């Protein structure tokens, strides 16, 4: 049985509207990209700063998730979405 990892990933983007559009449900969406490896995401943004964004991700396989982020598809998605990669932070759920 695979243990699901819950992660909070937050980052700044150049244009929150562009980032949000990439996450709209439908063909080619970021939801579809992550669903290929079984990841489900929920989207968030700061109501006073739409360029401060994030996702909560349910990740069944962290190695596959990291591979996707580093793949050509993942890097292209970040570039197209205007993600400021240097601002990206990820917290994973743990039990102390």
Question: How should each PLM-predicted stretch be described?
Answer:
Residues 1-77, 81-96:
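Short S/T/G/P-rich N-terminal loop/turn motif that feeds into the first structured element of a domain
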């Amino acid at each position: 049985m695979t243990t699901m990892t819950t992660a909070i990933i937050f980052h700044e983007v150049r244009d929150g509207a562009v980032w949000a559009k990439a996450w709209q449900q439908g063909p080619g969406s970021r939801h579809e990209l992550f669903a290929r490896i079984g990841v489900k995401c929920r989207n968030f943004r700061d109501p006073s700063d739409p360029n401060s964004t994030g996702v909560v991700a349910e990740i069944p396989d962290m190695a596959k998730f990291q591979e996707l982020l580093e793949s050509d598809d993942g890097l292209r998605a970040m570039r197209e979405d205007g993600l400021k990669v240097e601002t990206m932070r990820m917290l994973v759920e743990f039990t102390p």
